[in-house]
Amino acid sequence: NAKPEEVARIKSEALAMRGLALFDLTRLFGMPYTLDNGASLGVPIEIQTTLEDHAPERNTVAQCYEQVLKDLNDALGGLTKEKHDAYMNYWSVKALLSRVYLYMNDNENALKCAEEVINDNGGIYRLFTHDEYPSVWGKDFNSESLFEFYFTMSEPSGGSGGEGAPMVYADNVKDWNNLILTKAYLDLLNEDPEDVRHVFPHLPENAVADTLPVAAKGQPKYLIKYPGKSGSVTDAVSTVNPQDNDLCILRLSEVYLNAAEAAFKIGNTEKALTYLNAIVTRANPAKSVTSADLSLERILKERRKELVGEGHAFFDYMRNGKSV
């Protein structure tokens, strides 16, 4: 008895999720599209129900990206432009398309999709302000969240179970000291002592246990970007529980940085600076990037600072042919 528009929405959400899954599998198990225009092997494309003895073969990266684009574009027609927390909507798919096109070096389309999200969403999404920045990270469906996986402690698994992004929170008082911030990242952040993102790195609370790695002793090496629904990044690390922190997959700040990179690559310095400085100046209102300072390296640096702990840096450097 479902209404046709409801069936269309559910199908579109499934297509969007399939596109997201295939994209993530391809970038993880395949070479970057930009290496050889997708000629190398990616992952099998499986879009039909098969018998258990089916032996899938790998498709090329280009074929995988073609299917990703088809799924995402086919999804758009059945999705709402209204905010739909914990579900894919029109804007989250457009944001994902900006990411996919950027990975393909299709910068015209990457910029087009990113700008549509930024300029046409009707105010249902907006960047955090400088003052809001320290207090938003545990909240459900904040103003930048285009799509996130929802977790609650009432689930049998106990929220996220501490897996995924919340595990980036890793204080050695709980014996999770295998995930720490690198010196390279801390050096980037320390270039500006007034950067609001200094709220994320924390010193170990247990001085006795602060022994490994030796080179990082006494450094603020733990990332508390996921403090849980009742926590704050300014709380003591040992007092917060990240297990019920939602996992944000698509965030508006990334879309701005996608737009900045795409605009730079097609030679539109004005737009590149506009979108980049929205992030730079938010982090420190006294700072901005000038045309003389604008470069791909500067944009990637800002991506690394802003999107730390969100799973982007490795792929950003790989797709741009940079050393990791």
Go through the PLM ranges and name each one.
Residues N1-A165, W176, D187-V324:
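Acidic/polar-rich alpha-helix caps and helix-coil junctions
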